[in-house]
Structures are given as structure tokens and as C-alpha cells.
């Protein structure tokens, strides 16, 4: 059995899990659902979710671990939420949140406007910091990666958009 699927998920107070054709999770921050694989059986007993593969195939084991990880992310998302912080490094690089869009000045001849998908909120505490929040871990990470892709950190001066916890390894300039 998958080592990930061996760990049961304890459902926190205020979070409601419903099993049916799929798994629906409802909490204080919102609700999410995930279709269930026929290779995995899910049981809910006294606020504890357990996952077990049907049969002993490699695919069933893998699906059990994958489904457990996805459901755990859903439970965390609807109870606490997820956030990703980005930092802008460079002269004149600025960010400004306007409703459901993010306005970026990244040294191009035009401002870059990035629309946020449904369920994702963006804040700019300062002009060089961006905080992306939401209940869907995958969507938060994808939006952060999309924003970073406009101007990834370059290896000589480190200018660009980077994750706040990212370490940019700088190269030495060419010597004569």
C-alpha cells in the first residue's frame, strides 16, 4: 500500500466532508470537490478519512496516495487557505492590484495586466510584493508561476519576479 495513503486525514472542526460519486469538502472559506477513482475506497469514520487501494495493482496504490494528497489539500484549503508570495527585484519594477487583475510594470514598453481566475485573490502590501491567496493549492501555485513567467529572475543581477523564498544563484560576469 502507498505510504502516503497509509496516513489518515483528520477532518478539522468546521469542515464537512461528503462522500458520493466524488468527495466534496465544505468549510469556512468555501467548498471544493474531487472525482473519485474506482481504484480507491474512501471511508469516513468519526472525522477521520482513510484511503485504501482496491486490489494490489501498482496503479491502485498510486491512485490511493494521489487521492489522499488531493483531498488533504482540499481540507487545508477550505479551512486555512493557501498563499504564495512573490517579490519584484529591479529598478522600476512595480505591482498594483486592481480588483481581480494584477498590473505589473516589468521594464517592458507596456504594462502587463494579469487577470485572476475565479477563487483567487491578489494583494500588494508594497509595490514590490505580491500575495496570491485562494483555497485551491494547484490554482494558487499556477497563478504564481504564470506571474513569475513574465520576467523570471536572470542569473547575473537577479532582476525579475521571484518567489519570496526562492534563492537565485548568481553567475559571475565574463572576465577578459
Curated annotation (Swiss-Prot):
**Gene Ontology CC, one term:** cytosolic large ribosomal subunit
Question: What keywords is this UniProt entry annotated with?
Answer: Ribonucleoprotein, Ribosomal protein, RNA-binding, rRNA-binding
A Pfam family hit: Ribosomal_L6
The disulfide bonds in this chain are none
Q: Does the keyword rRNA-binding apply?
A: yes
- InterPro entries, alphabetically? Ribosomal_uL6-like (IPR000702), Ribosomal_uL6-like_a/b-dom_sf (IPR036789), Ribosomal_uL6_a/b-dom (IPR020040), Ribosomal_uL6_bac-type (IPR019906), Ribosomal_uL6_CS (IPR002358)
Q: Does the keyword Ribonucleoprotein apply?
A: yes
A single BP term in Gene Ontology = cytoplasmic translation
**Coiled coil stretches, renumbered:** none
A GO molecular function assigned to this protein is: rRNA binding
Q: What does this protein do?
A: This protein binds to the 23S rRNA, and is important in its secondary structure. It is located near the subunit interface in the base of the L7/L12 stalk, and near the tRNA binding site of the peptidyltransferase center.
Q: Which family does it belong to?
A: Belongs to the universal ribosomal protein uL6 family.
Tell me which NCBIfam families the record gives.
L6_bact
Q: How does it assemble?
A: Part of the 50S ribosomal subunit.
Return the protein name. Answer: Large ribosomal subunit protein uL6
Q: Species name for this entry?
A: Thiobacillus denitrificans (strain ATCC 25259 / T1)
